[in-house]
Every structure is written in C-alpha cells, then in structure tokens.
UniProtKB/Swiss-Prot annotation:
Substrate binds at T42. The gene is bioD. ATP binds at residues 13-18, 111-114, 175-176, 204-206. Its cofactor is Mg(2+). Homodimer. Catalyzes a mechanistically unusual reaction, the ATP-dependent insertion of CO2 between the N7 and N8 nitrogen atoms of 7,8-diaminopelargonic acid (DAPA, also called 7,8-diammoniononanoate) to form a ureido ring. It comes from Geobacillus sp. (strain WCH70). The keyword Phosphoprotein does not apply. It is found in: Cytoplasm. Mg(2+) binds at T17, K59, E111. Its EC number is 6.3.3.3. InterPro entries: DTB_synth_BioD, P-loop_NTPase. This is ATP-dependent dethiobiotin synthetase BioD.
C-alpha cells in the first residue's frame, strides 16, 4: 500500500502545481512510482479547451500520470463552481480514488484547490471545507508558500490554522525563492525559528518551465544528501 500526501498552500497562485510537479519528479528519481491527483479542477487553460492544472501536468511538464475527478469550467471557488455547473462533489468518492491510487502507486500527491479554508460544498448548515476533507480522512499535508514579502505572516497563519484543525503537517515548500534577496533569505530563516517544521525545498523561479527544467531541478536538489534525506524522512512519517 502506498502513501498519500495532500499539497495545500497559503493561498491561490502561489505555485502548488509547480511544487507538486517538483515532488513528483523528485520521488520518481528516488525510484518511487508516483501519481498526481487533483480531484477538483476549475478554470480552463489558455487554449480554452483543457483544464489549467491538467494542461500543466500533461502538456507543460509531461507528467502523464496525473488525474482529476471533478472538472468545472468556471474559474471560481469549488463550491461556487459546483453550484454554477450543477455538480455534486462527494468527499467519500475523492477518498475512494485516493485509496485506489495508493494500491497502485508508492506515492499519491493530492493537490488541493487554493488553501485549507476553501469551501468545497455549500450545505444548509454551513460549508464543507478543504480542511474538513483532510481532517476527516487523516491525510498529512505539505504547505506551499511564496518566499517573498508576506511569506512569514501567510505561512505562520496557515500553519496555525492547520494545527488548530488537528491536521498533521509534514513540512513547507517555498516558491520563487531568490537566494540573493535578503528578504527571501530572512523570511525562510525567521519561519524556521518560529515554526518547528522542516523546510522541504526552496524552489527558484525558472526562466522556462518544461519537463527538462523541472527534472533537472529535482535532480540537483537530490544531489544534496541532507535534502534527499529530508524527503525520505517526510515519506517515512506519511500515511
């Protein structure tokens, strides 16, 4: 039986899909059969036909082993997209698919839509949120954040919210990291001091994102034994 990790973020457009792609290439390089599953996808790609995240995984970085479950054209929050398209989102079906992939793959990377407080379903008595799905089915998470100005607040508040919800956090990934920026470097150092969580990776901005550049990034990262060991430790405590 494989393991599942939920990839969430401090907000939208912070690079969860990039981080998920990086992890997929890294785990594959480590010899692990890896599946990407983004159960809820909203909004179309620039071609106006494909769904944006699926297009990224399949066409941009060449990760054919990616899959979704609910595809809705409106580029809005899942609960609103479901209302606009008359779609019924079933959390149990999402988990059923995760368990199915765990039986076939070593690692299942589940990419969420937005952050932890994103509503998935609107009910008469309130909202069913992303954090409800994660908590109810006990899926550990990795939190993705941008590395620049605002990273400290966004990361600390997201971690605090996750901990209040009883969600297990495996570590953090920071996107668009510039090692020459005093702000970026200090943000990471400060967050490490404030939070007792491992920083799994600091990913730079890539001039061009392709399968080759993403694979090269993962390979370079794994050349560092400490970084490779950290990924192995993350896997050891995932379920």
């Amino acid at each position: 039986m494989g393991k599942a990790i939920f990839i969430t973020g401090t907000g939208t457009e912070i690079g969860k899909t990039v981080a998920t792609s990086f992890l997929a290439f890294a785990f594959q390089k480590m010899g692990l059969n890896t599946k990407i599953f983004k159960p809820i996808q909203t909004g179309l790609a620039e071609d106006g036909v494909s769904f944006a995240d699926q297009y990224w995984y399949e066409k941009v970085v060449g990760l054919a082993q990616s899959e979704g479950l609910y595809y809705m054209e409106p580029a809005v929050s899942p609960h609103l997209a479901a209302t606009l398209t008359n779609t019924t989102i079933d959390p149990a079906l999402i988990v059923e698919k995760i368990e199915q992939w765990k039986r076939q793959y070593d690692i299942v990377l589940v990419e969420g839509a937005g952050g932890l407080a994103v509503p998935l379903i609107e009910k008469e008595q309130g909202f069913y949120m992303t954090n409800d799905l994660i908590r109810e089915y006990n899926i550990p998470i990795i939190i993705v954040s941008l590395a620049g100005l605002g990273a400290i607040h966004h990361t600390v508040t997201t971690v605090s919210y996750a901990q209040q919800q009883g969600i297990r956090i495996l570590g953090l990934i920071f996107n668009q990291f510039n090692a020459e920026s005093i702000i970026h470097v200090n943000n990471i150092e400060t967050i490490k001091k404030m939070l007792d969580l491992p920083v799994i990776a600091t990913l730079p901005s890539l001039a061009k994102v392709t399968k080759h550049t993403m694979m090269a990034l993962a390979e370079r990262w794994l050349e560092n034994n400490e970084q490779k060991q950290l990924l192995q430790e993350v896997l050891s405590v995932a379920i």
